[in-house]
């Protein structure tokens, strides 16, 4: 197991849902965690409390990651104050229902700005510090990168881009930095989905349940400990990818 105690992590979108679980798990390994948020200030404060309670330390930082300068400033400030960066988790994402024929340029741009552009420029800015620490980048992709979801075509396209980015950066940044991704299935029910939607998903998933944040946490911890793994996209979807 990799010793993470006292090391430094940055988790984007850590104010709620899966991002919070990832941040708290890193705290439980003794890390100092920068809890990034944009709109969920109270949620970020709660995440920081949970990180501390788990045995780590935390700070919160607000940034609109769609603005590259804000994303870069967050990395710069963390490295300047802590002196290092060991783990970057690109978890922040935007998933909008955008059926073909109803997709607006505004929604398209918002998803690509956060899901793809922000993750790339954060990784680029963090690379010198991660190289010095022989650190790791973990990107949160999505099963939608490999499946076709008719009402979420642009979202799936952004996650396919995250997969390609992961593989390319793994090659470019080796050997000092490992870059991997996690492609979850449905982990927690997306906002606006009904219990009927949930039941349908359970019935079409081989393991007959939805995912939990802890499932993604387990994948993240494996990838952090797996020193001979890079460029991997670990699918965590209850077996949905083997249905066909």
Predicted regions and their residues:
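Conserved glycine-rich cofactor-binding loop
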Residues: 15-17
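Conserved glycine-rich Rossmann-like NAD(P)H-binding loop of the short-chain dehydrogenase/reductase
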Residues: 31-46
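The beta1-alpha1 cofactor-binding region of Rossmann-like NAD(H)/NADP(H)-dependent oxidoreductases
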Residues: 41, 62-73, 105, 214-215
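Conserved NAD(P)H cofactor-binding loop of Rossmann-fold oxidoreductase domains
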Residues: 91-96, 238-239
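Catalytic Tyr-X3-Lys loop
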Residues: 94, 101-120, 138, 155-158, ...
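Substrate-binding pocket helix/loop in short-chain dehydrogenase/reductase
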Residues: 99-100, 107-109, 193, 201
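Alpha-helical segment proximal to the catalytic Tyr-Lys
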Residues: 128, 170-175
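C-terminal substrate-recognition "lid" of short-chain dehydrogenase/reductases
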Residues: 129, 212-236, 241
């Amino acid at each position: 197991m990799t010793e993470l105690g006292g090391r430094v992590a940055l988790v984007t979108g850590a104010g709620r849902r899966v991002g919070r679980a990832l941040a708290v798990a890193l705290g439980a390994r003794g890390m100092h965690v920068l809890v990034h948020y944009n709109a969920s200030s109270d949620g970020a404060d709660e995440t920081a409390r949970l990180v501390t309670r788990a045995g780590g330390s935390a700070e919160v930082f607000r940034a609109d990651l769609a603005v590259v300068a804000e994303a870069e400033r967050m990395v710069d400030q963390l490295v300047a104050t802590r002196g290092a960066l060991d783990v970057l988790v690109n978890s922040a994402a935007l998933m909008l229902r955008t059926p073909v024929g109803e997709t607006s340029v505004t929604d398209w741009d918002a998803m690509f700005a956060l899901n793809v552009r922000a993750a790339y420029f954060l990784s680029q800015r963090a690379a010198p510090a991660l190289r010095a620490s022989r650190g790791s980048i973990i990107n949160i992709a999505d099963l939608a990168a490999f499946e076709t979801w008719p009402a979420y075509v642009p979202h799936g396209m952004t996650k396919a881009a995250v997969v390609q980015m992961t593989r390319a950066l793994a090659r470019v940044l080796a050997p000092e930095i490992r870059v991997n991704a996690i492609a979850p299935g449905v982990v927690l029910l997306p906002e606006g989905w009904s219990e009927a939607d949930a039941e349908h998903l359970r019935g079409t998933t081989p393991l007959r349940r939805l995912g939990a944040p802890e499932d993604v946490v387990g994948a993240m911890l494996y990838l952090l400990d797996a020193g001979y793994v890079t460029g991997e996209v670990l699918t965590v979807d209850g077996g949905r990818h083997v249905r066909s």
